[in-house]
Regions:
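A short glycine-rich, hydrophobically flanked beta-strand micro-motif that places a catalytic Asp/Glu
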Residues: 25-26, 88-90, 232-236, 375-383
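Short beta-strand scaffold segments in enzyme catalytic cores
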Residues: 117-120, 232-234, 242-243, 249-250, ...
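Non-catalytic accessory segments adjacent to catalytic cores
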Residues: 62-207, 307-309, 437
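Active-site pocket-lining segments that scaffold enzyme catalytic pockets across diverse folds
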Residues: 161-249, 293-296, 300, 307, ...
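An N-terminal JmjN-like helical accessory module and its immediate linker preceding a catalytic domain
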Residues: 1-53
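A residue-level signal for conserved active-site and pocket-lining positions in enzyme catalytic cores
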Residues: 90, 119, 195, 251, ...
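Conserved hydrophobic core element of enzyme catalytic domains
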Residues: 331-440
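Cytosolic ligand/metal-binding cores
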Residues: 122-154, 245, 252-331, 335, ...
């Protein structure tokens, strides 16, 4: 059942303020996009998959569940924002067998949830959908009681604010020393010079040890304020939460239209507008960064070509500026030859060279060998798909994995032939500043 609700309701606050200890939830917002948000709470059904075909298998499982889902005809609601009605919310690990270490237990290589309660909002429109799983032998009275119990727990409260105790200093420590990352970059550059590959993305992780359990709600709220142009997301299970702010769209599908973006090439921001503009101009003229951007955009175009009538990329990259960094980005659009499900499109594109490497076959085994870590869902995908197999997923970047009193932050850089290890390490430090000040 889908009903209109006041668009002034903070739907992420409603989800995070109403969660039970055993709940799963997901919030995805892009505040600058007319207050765009798709959020969900509880689990009427769960879809899981693993391995190289996890995107295809997850799409098939969602399709099978959709065939057994009886819903209001949201298509008749011309004002309903995208994401209205029953939706599957979740994401995918970076690697086919990712999220396999204890730190990531609670998530799977692919995991999507059909929420018991979901919200969609954009502009002046908002909708709430209630979904209930019906088993053989369930009584109508019992189903009604379950729905009422869930709705009675909903709270349209404000987000809690970050309020750190100044007397308590969390401990920040890299899971590996910075020199380990620099050595990994050096080895990657050697492989590139040897002709094994053009580019590889290497990540590192940093742990923040707090004095007590870390609540994701105020962190998500702070990210919404600091990064309103980004996809601000929070994925939660009873064991953990993943919270972040990503500047990168993986794919959006609306019928036969698809959109994505090639995002590669990064520099810092400056509080001085003149210096900030100069840094952006340098990035636009950088042969290294434009080459990195070209690798990503050309791969995306080649990937979408076989399933599209046409693919169109912007002639030149543009600057995307967020609070602490600025990137080169090339918007890409496609007219699909047939309505490929958004999850399958995501599987075709993932991992783009912006988070993996080029060629993928050479980068795939090199990344874990040099990084020595389980990326889990970092640099994977987070988002939603509806019963029509439309949807939207972002790349899970600039994120922290929260588990009890530890936050594990991730940051990575694209390594090409002229990469300098110290410069790449410095770039990861800049990217970590998206979340580190909120935790430390």
């Amino acid at each position: 059942m889908t009903v209109p609700i006041p668009s002034e309701i903070d739907v992420s606050a409603a989800v995070l303020g109403s969660r039970r200890a055993d709940d799963r939830w997901l919030c995805l917002e892009q505040p600058d996009r007319d207050g765009y948000a798709v959020c969900g709470l509880g689990a009427a059904a769960i879809v899981e998959a693993e391995g190289p075909r996890r995107f295809v298998e997850a799409a098939a499982a969602c399709r099978a569940l959709a065939a057994r889902t009886f819903a209001d005809d949201v298509g008749d609601d011309q004002h309903a924002p995208s994401g209205s009605g029953p939706v599957f919310l979740g994401g995918f690990a970076f690697a086919p067998d990712g999220a396999s270490t204890p730190a990531w237990s609670g998530l799977r290589p692919a995991q999507l949830v059909l929420p018991e309660v979901s919200f969609a909002r954009r502009g002046g429109e908002a909708r709430m959908t209630v979904t209930v799983a019906v088993e053989r032998g369930d009584s109508l009275a019992g189903l009604v009681d379950r729905v009422h119990a869930r709705l009675d727990e909903l709270r349209a409260a404000a987000m809690p604010m970050l309020d750190p105790d100044p007397a308590i200093r969390p401990r920040v420590a890299g899971a590996a020393p910075p020199s380990h990352y620099e050595e990994a970059v050096r080895r990657a550059v050697e492989r590139i010079h040897a002709g094994d590959l053009e580019k590889v993305v290497l990540a590192r992780e940093v742990d923040v040890h707090a004095a007590g359990p870390i609540d994701p709600a105020p962190i998500l709220d702070a990210l919404r304020g600091a990064f309103p142009a980004c996809y601000c997301y929070c994925v939660g299970t009873p064991e953990l939460a993943l919270v972040g702010a990503s500047p990168e769209l993986l794919v959006r599908r609306d019928g036969e239209r698809a959109q994505t973006v090639a995002l590669a090439g990064t520099t810092r921001r400056s509080a001085d507008p003149a210096v900030d503009d100069h840094l952006g101009e340098q990035l636009l003229r950088s042969d290294k960064d434009r080459g990195e951007q070209r690798i990503v955009s050309e791969r995306i175009e080649r990937t979408l070509g076989p399933v599209s009538l046409w693919v169109a990329a912007a002639d030149e990259p543009v600057l995307v500026k967020v609070q602490n960094v600025q990137h080169l980005a090339t918007p890409i659009r496609a007219q699909l030859a047939q309505p490929v499900p958004v999850l399958e499109l995501a599987g075709l594109l993932h991992p783009t060279p912006a988070v993996g490497g080029e060629p993928h076959a050479a980068a795939e085994p090199l990344i874990p060998a040099l990084e020595g870590l389980d990326r889990g869902w970092y640099s994977g995908a987070v988002g939603w798909t509806d019963l029509a197999e439309d949807g939207e997923l972002c790349v899970a970047l600039r994120c922290a994995l929260l588990r009890d009193d530890v936050a594990r932050l991730y940051a990575g850089c694209g390594i090409v032939a002229d990469s300098v290890p110290a410069d790449e390490l410095a770039e990861t430090e800049v990217k970590l500043q998206a979340l580190l000040p909120l935790l430390a």
